[in-house]
Amino acid sequence: MGRFLSCVLLTLSLPAAAQAPDWQLISQSRSNDQLVYWYVDASSIVRTDEYLRALLRTSWSAPQYGPDQTAYQSSTYLNYFDCGKRMIAYTGNTYYRNIEPVGLPVHEEPEQPLAQLTFQAVTPGSAGETRLDFVCKFRSKQFMT
């Protein structure tokens, strides 16, 4: 009976562990006397039709304020990457009070269908280019192994 219970508990814990984000810090910068950190959840990178899709996160060392003056210190969002054309589309922003995206969000913007998204060319040297380079290189390494 004890062995059975252990197996049940182990099985119940697996989905949660499999879904835990694998945040990889890909860049940081200084802006207005604060640090800005950009992360990619490496476990979320998947191919969707001709694009790569990944969950990203931005965190700030000091609170930011939305239009209604709600404070937040991190946001997560979905990016679609066209590696060949070097373009990105964004959707599904979720904002959190703390530097880690945990707990209840303070604001959420719904994910839009891929067909409704606008792809934008990345600016050389920008955080967008860093995200695109990381995701496209990371995924190509995964396909080669």
Regions found by a protein language model. Give the residues of each.
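Sec-dependent signal peptide recognition
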Residues: M1-L9
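N-terminal signal peptide c-region/cleavage motif recognized by signal peptidases
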Residues: S13-A17
